[in-house]
């Protein structure tokens, strides 16, 4: 999974990581350089971009859950070992919360629930709707939003939110 989000270096899933290597994502309009590679290796290559980044390079990025790449956008990836054309795989990640089973019990939610999350910020407070709950003992509690969403609410790196269902 690739991510253009500024939070890509803050990978909150346990047993997952941001690689030191970077790639360029090439679209018809321009190129995003130095995009993070997130691991471990998955069964199919997936590129997660903010809608702003996707639009700026001229690619389609439907809002999807991770792994749901059938019929999604195309791009070219260029890295130190060469390049590859992807016929699909570009998405804008659907906002979601990772949590452990104990967290889910505490917050009264279960895997795949869809909730809303209220964030109170200085002058830009808002409620994020359509937030998918993902529960696994491999996760650490964190909400994952992209740079566009974070900027819209004026979120800082350690922004707290409240599930309002």
Segments predicted by a language model, with ranges:
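Conserved "landmark" site that anchors the functional core of diverse proteins
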Residues: 1, 16-17, 29-32, 60-67, ...
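Short, small-residue-biased leader/transition segments that mark boundaries at the very start
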Residues: 2-12
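Composition-driven recognition of glycine/serine/threonine/acidic- and proline-rich low-complexity segments
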Residues: 15, 22-30, 38-42
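Short conserved beta-strand and strand-loop elements enriched in small hydrophobics
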Residues: 21-27, 74-80, 112-121, 159-165
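Ordered, amphipathic secondary-structure segments that act as subunit-interaction surfaces
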Residues: 32-80, 84
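Short, Lys/Arg- and Gly-enriched loop/turn segments at beta-strand edges
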Residues: 34, 122-131
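Glycine- and charge-enriched low-complexity intrinsically disordered segments
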Residues: 143-165
């Amino acid at each position: 999974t690739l991510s253009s989000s500024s939070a890509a270096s803050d990978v909150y899933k346990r047993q997952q990581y941001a690689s030191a290597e970077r790639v360029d994502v090439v679209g018809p309009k321009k190129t995003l350089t130095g995009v993070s590679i997130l691991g471990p290796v998955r069964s199919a290559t997936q590129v997660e971009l903010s809608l702003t980044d996707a639009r700026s390079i001229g690619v389609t990025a439907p809002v999807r859950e991770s792994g749901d790449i059938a019929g999604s956008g195309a791009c070219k990836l260029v890295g130190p070992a060469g390049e590859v054309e992807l016929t699909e795989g570009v998405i804008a990640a659907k906002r979601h919360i990772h949590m452990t089973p104990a967290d889910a019990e505490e917050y009264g939610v279960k895997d795949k629930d869809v909730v809303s999350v209220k964030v109170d910020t200085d002058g830009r407070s808002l409620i994020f709707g359509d937030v998918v709950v993902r529960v696994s003992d491999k996760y650490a509690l964190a909400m994952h939003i992209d740079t566009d969403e974070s900027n819209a609410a004026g979120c800082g790196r350690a922004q707290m939110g409240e599930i309002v269902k």
